[in-house]
UniProtKB/Swiss-Prot annotation:
Name under which the protein is recorded: Cobyric acid synthase
Primary role: Catalyzes amidations at positions B, D, E, and G on adenosylcobyrinic A,C-diamide. NH(2) groups are provided by glutamine, and one molecule of ATP is hydrogenolyzed for each amidation.
Pfam families reported in the protein's UniProt record: CbiA (PF01656), GATase_3 (PF07685)
Gene responsible for this protein: cobQ
Domain GATase cobBQ-type: 249-442
Source species, domain of life: Bacteria
Active site: C330 (nucleophile), H434
Pathway involvement of the protein, from the record: Cofactor biosynthesis; adenosylcobalamin biosynthesis
An MF annotation (GO) of this entry: ABC-type vitamin B12 transporter activity
Length: 495
């Protein structure tokens, strides 16, 4: 197996474009026939993905794996932090949750985490021809430098070259790049191979004097300037994207609970031309919806209390009274049930609380998470069976207390099991499946059930592929990658 130099992409800030840049590089290398894998030593994210072997990684790394045309693997994101309280996060190591830690607890744990990070990087290096690495936040965070595993701490330990990307759309790009480099140690500065400027709009000739100044002052080349790409529809790692009200469309409202998880579930709705998806925040009402969906949550008890404090439970009651449909996904499904018990104190003090009482299920939280990819059939009332795909990430086990319809049959290696519940009035549907809208047939079935006439799904896979190829094409035209991989790319004018 031929080997190519690994490369780490670090950023001057969060949301500088690291995730997209790594995805684009993975696709460019894959298009050249190179077996490439993405890697992020440490990630903090609201959204996670399930691997085939039942592990949990950041959804951004799953997206990057798709860009590389390889299957997601737990070693692509060995340390994942999922915030579940204001001061704490669940720590997931090589795909498995170990415990919840506060900031100081994790700070102390990082020195123990580095061996896992290096083990995962070694696995990818041995099994792929190239590894493209994504940093986290900024390498110049002075307060986070001790025992760093996410940025230069990892780069030094693994001895990998680095490029630094900055978002010019935010302003202050030269200060960001110059200042970030200046705050690094001499050995760290030496492994920086160049800069990338992201999201540029306008005439690049006006930028050239600044680029020349930056190269002269730092002695580092600018590898290129990537233009702002409009309408780039990729999963958001953390930020919730909402659109403005568009009259005449089918209105879907999602209450934003404090610990919302996997809001990427709603991307197929957000992108559909006939749907107006609205994320409803604190102090806002769910009234006026055609369809209400309770999202997943990383702290179901606390978020159920929050739903009641916002009087969204009253909005749901009124919505149902006037013939509306309601759906719950994962934690939202649990909230719709009769009871939620936490005897082990998974989410806080041990307790048992009443749910919203719309579905005849009772849920008990358990220490072991259910982490699995799912494929099966969805049968909604008065509809034919359709294909459904998704993934499960939950600690709760729900028991049906009545004879309500279970609409999803899941095929496993050993047997068949069932997921979800629909009430006898056919107005409420709950499921544990994240990604339930991604399969076009399931999308159409659920939205037809909810009341959208002549529903025709969009293909999320095609949309993602188009976006990744756009990114790769733009980067190939904009960057001089011969400075990193001279055996793969021809010299290109950087600007």
């Amino acid at each position: 197996m031929r080997k190519y130099s690994p490369l780490m992409v670090q950023g001057t800030t969060s949301d500088a474009g690291k995730t997209v840049l790594v995805a684009g590089l993975c696709r460019l290398l894959a298009n050249k026939g190179i077996q490439v894998a993405p890697f992020k030593p440490q990630n903090m994210a609201l959204n996670s993905a399930v691997t085939e072997d039942g592990g949990e990684i950041g959804r951004a790394q799953a997206l990057q794996a798709d860009a590389a045309r390889v299957k997601p693997h737990v070693h692509m994101n060995p340390i994942l932090l999922k915030p579940n309280t204001d001061i704490g996060a669940q720590v997931i190591v090589q795909g498995k949750a170990i415990e919840t830690m506060d900031a100081w607890g994790f700070h102390d744990y990082k020195k123990l985490a580095m061996p896992y990070v290096l083990e995962s990087f070694s696995y990818l290096s041995n099994n792929y021809e190239c590894v493209v690495i994504e940093g986290a936040g900024s390498p110049a965070e002075i307060n986070l430098r001790e025992n760093d595993i996410a940025n230069m701490g990892f780069a030094e330990a693994a001895d990998v070259p680095v490029i630094i990307v900055a978002d010019i759309d935010r302003g202050g790009v030269f200060a960001h790049l110059y200042g970030t480099l200046a705050l690094l140690s001499e050995s760290e500065q030496a492994r920086v191979k160049g800069f990338v400027i992201n999201r540029f709009r306008g005439d690049i000739s006006l930028l050239v004097p600044g680029l020349e100044w930056l190269e002269e002052k730092t002695g580092k080349p600018v590898l290129g300037v990537i233009p702002y790409l409009h309408g780039l529809n990729l999963e958001a790692e953390d930020a919730i994207k909402s659109e403005q009200l568009d009259k005449g469309k089918f209105v879907v409202k999602v209450p934003v609970v404090t610990r919302i998880s996997n809001h990427t579930d709603f991307d197929p709705l957000r992108l559909h031309p006939d749907i107006d998806l609205q994320f409803i925040g604190k102090g806002e009402s769910l009234s006026g919806a055609d369809f209400i969906i309770l999202p997943g949550s990383k702290s179901v008890q606390a978020d159920l209390d929050y739903v009641k404090s916002q009087r969204w439970d009253k909005d749901i009651e009124r919505h149902l009274r006037y013939g509306g449909k309601v759906m719950g996904i994962c934690g939202g499904y649990q909230m719709l049930g009769e009871y939620l018990a936490d005897p082990l104190g998974i989410e806080g003090a041990p307790c048992s609380i009443k749910g919203l009482g719309y579905l005849s299920i009772s849920t008990e939280l358990q220490k072991q998470k259910q982490l699995t990819l799912v494929e099966g059939k969805l049968v909604l009332p008065n509809q034919s069976a359709v294909k459904v795909k998704g993934y499960e990430i939950h600690a709760g086990v729900s028991t049906n207390l009545g004879q309500e319809h279970r609409p999803i049959s899941i095929h496993t290696k050993d047997a068949m099991r069932y997921d979800g519940t629909i009430n006898s009035e056919n107005s409420i549907f709950g499921t544990y499946l994240h990604g339930v809208f991604d399969e076009p047939e399931a999308f159409e079935a659920i939205l037809t059930w909810a009341g959208l006439e002549k529903c025709q799904a969009i293909n999320m896979h095609d949309i993602q592929e188009e976006a990744i190829e756009r990114i790769a094409k733009s980067m190939e035209e904009s960057l001089d990658l011969s400075l990193i991989w001279p055996d793969v790319f021809e010299k290109n004018k950087a600007y």
